[in-house]
């Protein structure tokens, strides 16, 4: 990949006080947002099918420990110890989606997840809001494409599992173009700016 050293160049330029913008595609497969959406979808499917197995618990803990929830380790431990998975905001929000899941498209399910878990506003707590929003937009478009070829929510879950487990790359352009900066890009990216 010709963009391997771009981050180093950016650090050097910014060290000497020169603002820079990187023009490169980022692989989103290892981003938290992809995992969170995948785990929320898994929770919804498991609740719909009333399967409270190890996979359900794994997905629950993933969401509970994320910036989308306010659970600390003691809360999670008590939920496990007392088997109180159904008495918390994560389960309640997912169950609300389950109630109307059969009449929703994959895009509508994602929209409900983003809305009920206040995903966009929670980005503020972790920063990099624009890039995280681009990931959600990419997923929204992808879910629409999967809707158009007849994929159900279980198929979407399998699709996301496949991407993550096979370590495939999904690259999207996450360029931050703020102001008057030095632009670092490959020759191929520069051709589009002529």
Name what the model sees in each region.
Residues 1-58, 99, 108, 113, ...:
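Conserved motor-region signature of P-loop NTPase helicases/translocases
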Residues 57-103, 107-108:
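Polynucleotide-recognition surfaces of large bacterial nucleic-acid defense/processing enzymes
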């Amino acid at each position: 990949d010709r963009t391997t050293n771009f981050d180093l160049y950016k650090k050097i330029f910014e060290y000497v006080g020169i603002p820079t913008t990187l023009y490169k595609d980022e692989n989103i497969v290892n981003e938290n947002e992809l995992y969170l959406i995948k785990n929320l979808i898994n929770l919804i499917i498991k609740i719909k099918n009333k399967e409270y197995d190890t996979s359900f618990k794994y997905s629950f803990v993933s969401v509970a420990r994320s910036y989308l929830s306010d659970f600390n380790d003691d809360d999670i431990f008590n939920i496990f110890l007392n088997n109180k998975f159904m008495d918390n905001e994560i389960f309640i929000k997912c169950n609300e989606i389950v109630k109307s899941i059969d009449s929703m498209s994959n895009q509508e399910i994602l929209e409900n997840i983003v809305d009920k878990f206040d995903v966009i506003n929670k980005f503020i707590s972790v920063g990099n809001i624009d890039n995280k929003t681009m990931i959600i937009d990419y997923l929204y478009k992808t879910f629409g494409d999967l809707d158009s070829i007849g994929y159900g929510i279980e198929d979407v879950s399998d699709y996301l599992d496949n991407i993550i487990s096979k370590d495939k790359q999904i690259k999207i352009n996450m360029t931050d173009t703020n102001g008057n900066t030095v632009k670092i890009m490959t020759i191929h990216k520069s051709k589009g700016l002529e």
